[in-house]
From Swiss-Prot:
Gene name linked to the record: bphB
Active-site residues from the entry: Y155
Pfam families in alphabetical order: adh_short (PF00106)
Record-annotated disulphide pairs: none
Protein name, entry field: Cis-2,3-dihydrobiphenyl-2,3-diol dehydrogenase
Family that this chain belongs to: Belongs to the short-chain dehydrogenases/reductases (SDR) family.
Domain of life the protein comes from: Bacteria
PROSITE patterns, alphabetized: ADH_SHORT
Phylogenetic lineage: Bacteria, Pseudomonadati, Pseudomonadota, Gammaproteobacteria, Pseudomonadales
Length: 277
């Protein structure tokens, strides 16, 4: 397996894409520490994966919680090779005109504190261990870090900020730590919204994303969370990704190559090539 003996710390790793990443990295024989706010889901991870996983309950907005996750990871597994800042919330595409004036400041702070400051805290907390291991950071971005309409102005601005973090930290931490980013598209998950906008109990799985993306993406469907994990394994693999730092992999299902009048230009290929589906 590609990551035998490697140690990975993932924030927001107890559900959604984060959970898929934990499963994939364990399958690649890595040891994984997870910082998440849900003690119940962390306990389930440890039950499912045994000594391969360490769960740490905490809030990514707290530098002390992030430092505790880093120190407990090193105490149990001896090092940190890969850090994946992944915890986040979505603003459910709340447009500027729909943002209540009385909630705007709180909503901005909540989205940016989790989606941006939480990432900075993670790197700050893990930096000594990452430099010591000559490790790497893989930021979870989003297609909203590259295109409009993947969220409202708060989410989109936050994800564009993460793109800037990848580039700046790739410079600042070279040559000892590689820093890259993966931009997944929509995933049917438990991703929540800002509590400051009354969306803390709302999950993205309640949105008919599969139907929406089927007609928009050239690949013709919404990918599963597991299908995005290979990009993270690639960046974490020392041999395969040694030259990669400051790289941004926008996994957009072909959104960037949509035609003006249709999502995919090859819809008639099976018929024209006489291939039975």
């Amino acid at each position: 397996m590609k990551l035998t003996g490697e140690v990975v710390l993932i924030t927001g790793g107890a559900s959604g894409l984060g959970r898929a990443l934990v499963d994939r990295f364990v399958a690649e024989r890595a040891k994984v520490a997870v910082l998440d706010k849900s003690a119940e889901r962390l306990a389930q991870l440890e039950t499912d994966h045994g000594d391969n996983v360490l769960g740490v309950t905490g809030d990514v907005r707290s530098l002390e919680d992030q430092k505790q996750a880093a120190s407990r990871c090193v105490a149990k597994f001896g090092k940190i090779d890969t850090l994946i800042p992944n915890a986040g919330i979505w603003d459910y595409s709340t447009a500027l005109i729909d943002l209540p004036e009385e909630s705007l400041d709180a909503a901005f702070d909540e989205v940016f504190h989790i989606n941006v400051k939480g990432y900075i805290h993670a790197v700050k907390a893990c930096l000594p261990a990452l430099v010591a291991s000559r490790g790497n950071v893989i930021f979870t971005i989003s297609n909203a870090g590259f295109y409009p309409n993947g969220g409202g102005p708060l989410y989109t601005a936050a994800k564009h900020a993460v793109v800037g973090l990848v580039r700046e930290l790739a410079f600042e931490l070279a040559p000892y730590v590689r820093v890259n980013g993966v931009g997944p598209g929509g995933i049917n998950s438990d991703l929540r919204g800002p509590s400051s906008l009354g969306m803390g109990g709302k999950a993205i799985s309640t949105v008919p994303l599969a139907d929406m993306l089927k007609s928009v993406l050239p690949i013709g469907r919404m990918p599963e969370a597991e299908e995005y994990t290979g990009a993270y394994v690639f960046f974490a693999t020392r041999g395969d990704a040694a030259p990669a730092t400051g790289a941004l992999l926008n996994y957009d299902g072909g959104l960037g190559v949509r035609g003006f009048f249709s999502g995919a230009g090859g819809n008639d290929l099976l018929e024209r090539l006489n291939i039975n589906s």
